[in-house]
Structures are given as C-alpha cells and as structure tokens.
Amino acid sequence: MIAFATPIYYYEMSGQLKTLLDRANALFPSDYAFRDIYLLTSATEDEPDTDERAIHGLEGWIACYEKCRLAGTVFAGSVTEPGAVAGHPALETARAMGAAIA
C-alpha cells in the first residue's frame, strides 16, 4: 500500500509528487509488493472536480503497474491557511479509509 499526499496547484498534483512518480520507473521491472494506491489532496478551491487532473495523472502511473489499483482518494477543499484542515470532513473520511486497510 502506498498513500500519496499533495496540495493541488493549478488543478494538478505538486511538482514534487510528479517528480517522485517520474523517478520511480526503477520499480517497474521489480517484483514490487505494493498493490493499493491512495491519494490525499488539499486545495484552496472547493469544487468537487478540483483534484480530477491529479487523480488522472496518478492513474497514468498506476497503469504501468498492472498489479496495482487506485484504492481511494480523499479531497479537502477550502484549505488555505495553516490549521484550516482541523475539523474538515475530509479528515474523518481519511480516518475511515485508513481504518479499513487491513
């Protein structure tokens, strides 16, 4: 299991996450143990599709690893200031998702 987290900038994942995914190509020929992939995102924007492009970008990476699947995503919108995520409904969604991972 791998859980990636990224802020959404201009409706896309951060450059740091994109670089990590691009540099992970050494995993491709290996007998990797991860199967389920999760994506946690946050943004100032609060539209339901704000993280859509980041999800599609990650799905492109996942498609290269036939044993993997996107197991879940969590989006926290309207998160601008430090601490703004406190009490956000996405936290409970993330907790429940994490608790379901065995």
Question: What annotation goes with each model-predicted range?
Answer:
Residues M1-Y65:
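Helix-loop-strand module that forms the ligand-binding subsite of alpha/beta enzymes
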Residues E59-A102:
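Glycine-rich phosphate/pyrophosphate-binding loop and the adjoining helix
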